[in-house]
Amino acid sequence: MMHEMTATLSDGPKTAVSPSFGLRLATLSPLETLAQSVSTIAPSTSPTLTVPLVFALAGDGTCLAYALALGLIVLVGLCVARFARESASPGSLYEYTRGSLPPVLAALTAWALFFAYAMTASSVIGGFLNYAYVFLGGLGPRVPAALLACAVAAVATWVAYRDVKISARLMLWIETISVVLIACVVGLTLVRHGLHLDRAQFDLRHISLGRLRLGGMLAIFSFVGFESATTLGAEAREPLRTIPRAVIGSALLAGAFFLVCSYGEVLGFRGAPTSLATSTAPMRYLAARAGISFAGVIIDAGVLVSMFAATLGCVIAASRVLLLMAHNGLAHGRLQQTHHHNQTPGLASIVAGLAALLPALGLVVRGVGGADIYGWMGTLAVFGFLTAYVLTAAALAAHLRRRGRLGSGTAVLTVSAVVAMMVALAANIYPVPEAPYRYFPYIYLAYLAGAALLCRRGLAKFARV
């Protein structure tokens, strides 16, 4: 049963908690709300998969690349948190733009956000496949990649379908254990090198600014999903207070973790026979150099499970965006139904799980490796996230200006966020990257065009809403 909205964004400075849309009310604690954003970021996966990719581009500037990415994400996070203090809804960034931008742009935000979460889930399924074979090695017969992909997607969808509270607790424990273990290895690596500053990582005379820019754009993928706590809406306790804190807190905590890890990994691989850029298990190598080889195996196991947690977090976020889209005519009406007992978006969870599985499964069948799936799907996801981030920052400026509350500080914030994200988006397009990355912008545009064609009738209804 829906609960009446106490206020809307158009009411001025008042705040609002949206209807529950059949979801459980006030079921998640502040820590569990934070867990949604943290698990979608999946901080333990970046030191093992993303940092080596950033190092391949930025070299010794890897830590600076992460500092650049953190600055951009904080700008967007401040815009999102400002909205989250005024309204809580399972529609996330889509709900924020719906009340402030023209219907077409709000619909664009919705479809971009759903695409971003689904592609991120598909990406980490690829990461799961890659790391499963690294971790399992020669233990027993090799399980077919297609079967592994189906298994991780099916279990994540089932948990999301079953209970969001169980999901949040599970994700919190998984990420906490993984992050603590990685922090221990990085800490021992720093101690082993005498805790002195590695000046080479901050000497701009020997760091290519062009490659630093490219590395910084790739480092953004480590942060995407930090805003996913906003998809919980009224499922969180005191959502107007806990959700903004989760958004900013997850970005800052993850950023600090990434800065330390990227610095420690670059330092730890100096003089190593294998480059960080080509290492398949960097934490296992660093653990061995620190004299605690057993920790490397435990970390690999934790990262593997963290990949599952990230898949789960993305399915949860995508299903709730899809739920509100269905309520507003942007998706099939049956997707707005919630399970009568679990009080979760049952059918939307299944659709989100399938949207995550099918791209990864299609690539696996064609013989594409897990690492490539992680990189390719992650790049596609960035297009969706950057689109949603740009429109959310613009929506905040429009929302406050319409109500005469746009101060100079907020104006500078929103303009800075929009410009920063537009630059990041352009960096993924020009200079024209090599194949297959050069085709990804066209795939994304084709997806948006297809969504618009499918929802022509729904767009008219949405405009009336």
Please place each PLM-identified region on the residue numbering.
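Hydrophobic transmembrane alpha-helices that form the core helical bundles
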Residues: L49-A56, A65, V74-A153, W158-Y161, ...
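A generic transmembrane alpha-helix motif of multi-pass inner-membrane proteins
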Residues: L380, G384-F385, L406-V465
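Membrane-water interface regions at transmembrane-helix termini and the short interhelical loops
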Residues: R24, F83-A84, L108, N130, ...
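TM-loop-TM module centered on a large, flexible mid-protein loop between adjacent transmembrane helices
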Residues: E95-T97, P102, Y133-G138, A246-V315, ...
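Helix-loop-helix junctions that connect adjacent transmembrane segments
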Residues: P19-R24, T62-C63, L139-A145, L172-A301, ...
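Membrane-interface loop-to-helix entry segments
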Residues: V143-H193, I207, V247-A251, G384-V390, ...
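Select transmembrane alpha-helical segments in multipass membrane proteins
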Residues: T27-S37, P102-F115, L148-A151, H206-A219, ...
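Membrane-interface "cap" regions at the ends of multi-pass membrane proteins
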Residues: M1-G61, I73-L78, R199, D203, ...
